[in-house]
Swiss-Prot record:
MF-aspect GO terms: dinucleotide phosphatase activity; NAD+ diphosphatase activity; zinc ion binding
Tissue-specific expression: Expressed abundantly in the brain and kidney, and at lower levels in the liver.
Broad class of enzyme this protein falls into: hydrolase
Cofactor note: Binds 2 Zn(2+) ions per subunit.
Designated name of the protein: Ectonucleotide pyrophosphatase/phosphodiesterase family member 5
Sites where the protein binds Zn(2+) 2: D191, H195, H339
Post-translational changes noted in the entry: N-glycosylated.
Cellular compartments annotated: Secreted; Membrane
Domain of life according to the entry: Eukaryota
Segments passing through the bilayer: 432-452
């Protein structure tokens, strides 16, 4: 009797467990979106209903400390490796490696030498090594062959490709026959305009509104593809932006002989490579030359920047105060908005918002580090993290206390495109969910009745058997 009882119990337990959850996807899905140069307080400069919709229905971090230097390529590589710039090797947008005797330049799009990228392993490679698929639409570095690998799907960088076309590719990859579980999407604004006009310009308002409109378009497309409630959407950036002016310019030619050094990287962190035998002369001429310029020998760079332990960091690094601009002379290009300054400055900090089945709702956290995103992604995707500088414990409170699981999609009547009122709170479950739970409950009840009948019959049979045992000795007497 015991084996039959156990079999029935196991069958009941299996059905009770599986029925309500049979509609759930097998794994978490994550989409990371970066709006380049989106400073943390842009959310409040003009109405941003779609950003606030995510904040209301997901999580928001007020202050994200990114890595020094606060530029595009170092910080985008930090987001996907969890490493400081000195550890992942992309120390600037423009670099010189004395070991390789090669240069790296974002300005000239000379960025495709794999050796510059292979001091670290981006998470899309780890994800693919675990048997999953990844996709990247214009994410910086994703079109570079790193450790003999590209993302499963990727778009070669082309600034002319529209945001809508990039979104279409992301949706296609998430809904393919062999879908991705990890996607990356990059957009150049508001960084481009921020450089041109400066973050304090009234012209920035329309650009921020347009980025919000594009986020609304992404939300609409995710809902249309029935992905909104099943994909964990993370919206972030690489850095902020500060206002500059031509009245705050530091000209290196006023202090240095240009024949004595090579300027590897420019404002606001000048990476200076002195010519052979000219180190002391260059350093002495520049140190103390301007009250708004701090000059470091490489070994004297502050530890808090985690920046000096890499061959690509030049022997002399000159850092301008916030809002000050470094030029060789006034004939060089000047930008009204700039970034790259000390990562402790609030104006250098980017945004961080997230929505999805793994995240809490209407929750705001005060602070995190950009290095923490990598460990969060590894946790969501159940990947073994490689060594990194972030901390999962620093961001675990962003997650729902319940075991993260995607929920079935339900169409909202509000598409969140161009609306100032993004609509009502999201539904937590849909009709398919309730149908699944109901079917599971009915099946459980049926098997419970069958089990009770089985137990009753077993008891009757046992009583009859015992009666025969009791009567048997009397017959023998």
């Amino acid at each position: 009797m015991i084996p039959e009882f156990l079999l029935a119990s196991c069958t009941l337990a299996t059905l009770c467990h599986s029925a309500p959850f049979s509609l759930q996807p097998e794994e978490q899905k994550v989409l990371v979106v970066s709006f380049d140069g989106f400073r943390w307080d842009y959310l409040y400069k003009v109405p941003t209903p779609h950003f606030h919709y995510i904040m209301k229905n997901g999580v928001h971090v007020n202050q994200v400390t990114n890595v020094f230097i606060t530029k595009t390529y170092p910080n985008h590589y930090t987001l996907v490796t969890g490493l400081f710039a000195e550890n992942h090797g992309i120390v600037a947008n423009d670099m010189f490696d004395p070991i390789l005797n090669k240069s790296f330049s974002l300005e000239h799009m000379d960025i495709y030498d794999s050796k510059f990228w292979e001091e670290a392993t981006p998470i899309w490679i780890t994800n693919q090594r675990a048997g999953h698929a990844s996709g990247a639409a214009m994410w910086p570095g994703a079109d570079v062959k790193i450790h003999d690998s590209f993302p499963t799907y990727y778009l070669p960088y082309n600034e002319s490709v529209s945001f809508e076309d990039r979104v279409a590719k992301i949706i296609e990859w998430f809904t393919a026959k062999d879908p991705i579980n990890l996607g990356f999407l990059y957009w150049e604004e508001p960084d481009d305009t921020g450089h041109d006009v400066g973050p304090d310009s009234p012209l920035m308002g329309s650009v921020i509104s347009d980025v919000d409109h594009k986020l609304g378009y992404l939300i609409k497309m995710l809902k249309r593809a029935k992905l909104w409630n099943n994909v964990n959407l993370i919206v972030t950036s690489d850095h902020g932006m500060t206002q500059c002016s031509k009245q705050r310019v530091i000209e290196l030619d006023r202090y240095l002989d240009k024949e004595h050094y090579t300027l590897i990287d420019h404002s606001p962190v000048a990476a200076i490579l002195p010519k052979e035998g000219k180190f002391d002369e260059v350093y002495d001429a520049l140190a103390g030359a301007h009250p708004n310029l701090t000059v470091y020998k490489k070994e004297e760079i502050p530890e808090r920047w985690h920046y000096k332990h890499n061959d690509r960091v030049q022997p002399i690094v000159a850092v301008a105060d916030e809002g000050w601009y470094i030029l060789q002379n006034k004939s060089d290009d000047f930008l009204l908005g700039n970034h790259g300054y000390d990562n402790a400055l609030a104006e250098m900090h980017p945004i961080f918002l997230a929505h999805g089945p793994a995240f809490r709702k209407n929750f705001t956290k005060e602070a995190m580090n950009s290095t923490d995103l990598y460990s969060l992604l590894c946790h969501l995707l159940n990947l073994t993290a490689l060594p990194h500088n972030g901390s999962f414990w620093n961001v675990q409170d962003l997650l729902s206390s319940a075991t993260p699981k995607p929920i079935p999609y339900t169409q909202s009547t509000t598409l969140l495109l161009g609306s100032d009122k993004p609509g009502e709170d999201e539904q937590e479950e849909s009709y398919p969910y309730y149908i699944g739970v109901s079917l599971g409950s009915i099946i459980a009840m049926v098997f419970f009745v069958v089990l009770i009948k089985h137990l009753i019959r077993s008891q009757v049979h046992t009583l009859q058997y015992r009666q025969v045992e009791v009567a048997q000795p009397l017959l023998q007497a």
